[in-house]
Amino acid sequence: MKTPVITRFAPSPTGFLHIGGARTALFNWLYARHTGGRMLLRIEDTDRQRSTPEATAAILDGLAWLGLTWDGEPISQFARASRHKEVAEELVARGQAYYCYCSPEEIEAMREKARAEGRPPRYDGTWRDKDPAEAPSGVKPVIRIKAPLEGETVIHDRVQGDVRFPNKDLDDFIILRSDGTPTYMHAVVVDDHDMGVTHVIRGDDHLTNAARQAIIYRAMGWDIPVMAHIPLIHGPDGGKLSKRHGALGVEAYRAMGYLPSALCNYLARLGWSHGDDEVMTTEQMIEWFDIDDVNKGAARFDFQKMEALNGIHMRQMDDEALFGIFIATLPHLEGGQAFLDKLDEKRRGQLRSALPGLKERAKTLLELLDGAGFLVAERPLTIDDKAAELLDGDARAMLATLAEEMAGLGDWTAESTEAAVRNFAENTGRKLGKVAQPLRAALTGRTTSPGIFDVLAVLGREESLGRIRDQAVEK
């Protein structure tokens, strides 16, 4: 029977869930879902100075917002310190590790000597074969692994291929500090083994760690998980991703109005592809994703592409689903809470009606909010500078006449108001734009909006006529 796939996402809670971590989580999640397996979550909180509960909460919130649900309870690495110590001591008992009593000064002297001789600054194995009886009194030792002295360690990587590390470069690294706490290198191996992790999918900046971790696995006689080291995300110029180029936490993307489904789609395409498909649903990504198809080369982050993709997702999304996400996101958008506070039941209905037109003109929820502002604007409207230019004396006089004609309409719909405005333009010898543009300025305070007849229908007779008359003057 085939062993079920178990992946894991293991962030350090020292800040928000950044975009690179989000993609790593996504790849782990997609592969687990694709294979019918599980994705576990481990919080690597052993750095007590930098790890905070707030950062842990932010990471969990970011994953939940993206829809990357984990299986089981999150595991705290710090809480497993006694288990890490137990395995380190077992390695000593097996003869695969040893106590080292070197002082920091002695270690530094070794490194200086190695540098002077043109060798890498490595620990020289002083205590590797020493009799523990020679241990100095009053000195708390560290535990070091007995790394192989010759040959090479080969990592069979699903993305990078076979990667070879000369064992002479790996040295006898520390697995347990003198205070009894584990090093990252050791804790990761013990946790992955105990959690039953079958596939380790992480950034290729961890590739050198894989060689050292393989030594611990072999020393314990444990199976080494399948390794897949995915390329890092670079900026548009090919350099390290900076905040200016997108190296932000996912909460920043929520505040910029990106849909979680669109962000996941974009992140999946950074380093992985499925033919020429650019726009994918979550279900399609789960069906198509395979870790073997991830590219070795670094992917370049492009804000414009992501924004365009977000716009496509918004336009393709069911209106009711988009309405729900928009309402839920409003508290995270600049000006969104104030908009939300004004959304009574009537205006919620108006927003639902306006959504088809609004989403055609928006690439983000922030732009959608901006476009929807006219719905909650208080009379008399604040008119922006461009719109004010359209409302000269002739235009205002025209609006007064138009308001009187439209007041007599029986039905007030997009179709009936369009017919009335077109008739008015024709009867007064004006082009439609010469009527519609000042009308838009009066109704929304701006020069851009959804279709003007949709705006009239959404606002309704009373509000529309009130706004037109506010900007009109009698002849």
Swiss-Prot record:
It catalyses: tRNA(Glu) + L-glutamate + ATP = L-glutamyl-tRNA(Glu) + AMP + diphosphate. The keyword Nucleotide-binding applies. PROSITE patterns: AA_TRNA_LIGASE_I. GO terms for biological process: glutamyl-tRNA aminoacylation. A motif ('KMSKS' region) lies at residues 240-244. Its main location: cytoplasm. HAMAP family: Glu_tRNA_synth_type1. Monomer. Catalyzes the attachment of glutamate to tRNA(Glu) in a two-step reaction: glutamate is first activated by ATP to form Glu-AMP and then transferred to the acceptor end of tRNA(Glu). Belongs to the class-I aminoacyl-tRNA synthetase family. Glutamate--tRNA ligase type 1 subfamily. This is Glutamate--tRNA ligase 2.
